[in-house]
């Protein structure tokens, strides 16, 4: 099973794409966002639930549900600070969160907007 961490403009379409072939858990810390997605509402208009036949996708903000997964794809934002340096706070927080539930053999992938260097 696959966990997509962060359901913004990168994570949500990725979760939907993977859910066409695999069981996927879409995780976000924003409980309002999870509630909207569970009610088939996407205020960002990244996906159109009417056009999607999504059956293998569960939206959650409960980290415990992700223990079932063995692939974790982190897609959280990496904004630029006032010095034009990437703010890695979201990336670090997401990493520390899933580190608590990782098992031997699990795979973590960073699909981030951070620039190289």
Predicted regions and their residues:
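Structural/interface elements that position substrates and couple domains in central-metabolism enzymes
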Residues: 1-117
